[in-house]
Amino acid sequence: VKYLLLPQTDTRILPFYLAMEEYAARIIKDDDIFFMWQVNPTVIFGRNQLIANEVNIPYCREHGIATYRRKSGGGCVFADMSNIMMSYITCSDNVELTFSRYTSAVVEVLKKLGLNASDNGRNDILIDDRKVSGNAFYHLPGRSIVHGTMLFDTDMAHMQGAITPSTEKLASKGVKSVRSRITTLSEHLAGKMNIEQFKDFVKSEMCDGDILLTDSDIAQIEEITQTYLTPEFIYGSNPRCTNTFQKRVDGVGEFQISIELDHNIIKDINIAGDFFVLGSIDESIIAPLKGVSYTRETLTEALKDLDASTVIASMTTEQLINTILN
């Protein structure tokens, strides 16, 4: 595993680092890649989430907290300079294997610091059964990206104020608030190590060499960054709804379904949520459903060739149809 270095260490906006992942995944083929980064206060929401459902926009504006969408699925997270973001790029196509390989490696690093670390089998890393790291998955041809948080310390007031998880999501985890289900490394390290020392330790344990990006690399990364900054990408689009509902599917995630119907014919549909995406929802699910009747029989026929688990991680086609039908 090689550590990816920038020629300058200035803090950049969050989409730059997401673009850096994409660039590395496309250009560097011979090595697995790892790097860490930090940003000024920012909320990052998943590829298929509705910003109005997940982010307290007035709070973010009032406190100067940036908001950006990423291209991976999963839920909404808050990051600041006390929260280390980690990126891992590998050639594996298997989502479960990629997650497992990465989270297991990070858990082992934390255990070497004497911490009671574990992973929860999906995408979180825990210390004493409380979340210290959440991760998401993004697939490019021939390469997979896992990226996520590592809560060294953070502004809990901003984290709670900026993000608005549904009560159903919290209830599914058996907790009453964001604060009660997370922890920070600083709580457990008790002053033994500062954030820079921790980053140095992680790098030494995870990597066996460096790759230094050039000014030409940076220019190309900045071009990719622009794709994250369009209003269309950040805010997305919703059909004019005649039917909107929310549903949680155990082991898969939370869904917000918006459907535009005309005499019970599906004119448009939007599937949002914090689930993990492995394929194209637009091509594999939405396109086949446009123009069909909103009934179980016609949905089943329209999706008869679909294996939903190849598009949405851990979901069966029957679960998908049940979710769309509410």
Task: Describe each region flagged by the PLM.
Residues 119-136, 218-226:
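Beta-rich nucleic-acid/ligand-interaction surfaces
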Residues 138, 142-144, 148-181:
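Phosphate/diphosphate-binding glycine-rich loops and adjacent basic-rich segments that engage nucleotide
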Residues 114-122, 208-221, 296-300, 310-314:
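Flexible, glycine/charged-enriched surface loops at secondary-structure junctions
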Residues 1-97:
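N-terminal lobe of the biotin/lipoate ligase/transferase fold
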Residues 83-123:
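Contiguous, small/hydrophobic- and glycine-enriched helical/loop subdomains that border
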Residues 159-160, 169-213:
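A conserved active-site cap/scaffold subdomain adjacent to cofactor or substrate pockets
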Residues 218-263:
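Structured beta-strand/loop patches that form or line metal/cofactor-binding pockets in enzymes
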Residues 182-185, 261-326:
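Active-site- and interface-proximal helix/loop "cap" or "latch" segments in soluble metabolic
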